[in-house]
């Protein structure tokens, strides 16, 4: 499955980047393709392109702040608190698989 994700926490420091790493590791274990955009204290990094969005199966927004979803129109979007990704990254991805079947 091709997953695009955004991680963002209120401070934009640690959890944003830890969640990114946890999602990447879980996706690798499950055989998924993933790209994670971070919206942290230093701004947006690894920004998702329109082409990547078009090719994605699902968009995962793991954020405790507001994320603009306009660019994801027509795509399935799953929103989940960043704390869930921090604790259960593989479980979050498994739930997405279930919803997409």
Describe the residue ranges of each PLM region.
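Glycine-rich phosphate/diphosphate-binding loop of Rossmann-like nucleotide-binding domains
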Residues: 1-2, 12-27
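Short glycine-rich or small-residue beta-strand-to-loop segments that form or flank ligand, phosphate
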Residues: 2-11, 60-61
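Ser/Thr/Gly-rich flexible loops in soluble cytosolic domains mediating phosphotransfer, phosphorylation
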Residues: 3-4, 77-101
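Glycine/Thr-rich phosphate-binding loops of Rossmann-like dinucleotide-binding domains
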Residues: 14, 69-70
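N-terminal beta-loop-helix "entrance" segment that forms/cooperates
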Residues: 29-56
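Short, well-ordered alpha-helix to beta-strand connector turns
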Residues: 56, 74-75
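Short, well-ordered beta-strand core segments
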Residues: 59-60, 77
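Short, polar loop motifs at secondary-structure junctions
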Residues: 62-67
